[in-house]
A protein has these predicted regions:
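Conserved, structured core segments of small domains
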Residues: 1-102
Length: 102
């Protein structure tokens, strides 16, 4: 199944401002993970100026919907976001595909 990377660019004072929105953001992330949509997610560090979230699905709709619902986006902590298709060439997913084609 295809992967999609959701890239976030954050405001300079993101860490200082995220507190009141963090619980809701994490709730949305955990729900997406429980549905099998969100595979990995986390903030970028040094500097903490963005985040990367990896989704899996037939199309980018789940990643796009997550961004539109995310309180970080809705409250201006994320200045820009974009979703890109991600081709995995090394990892568990590639082993599974190799086994299926054998």
């Amino acid at each position: 199944m295809p992967y999609y990377a959701l890239f976030y660019e954050a405001v300079d004072d993101f860490i200082a401002r995220r507190g009141e929105f963090r619980d809701e953001h994490l709730r949305l992330a955990r729900e997406a993970h429980a549905r099998g949509e969100l595979v990995l997610a986390g903030a970028l560090a040094d500097p903490a100026d963005g985040a990367l979230l990896i989704f899996q699905g037939e199309n980018p709709a789940a990643a796009e919907a997550f961004a539109r619902r995310d309180p970080y986006v809705k409250n201006g902590l994320i200045t820009t976001w974009k979703v890109r298709s991600w081709t995995v060439v090394v990892g568990n997913e590639t082993r599974a595909r190799s086994a299926e084609s054998a």
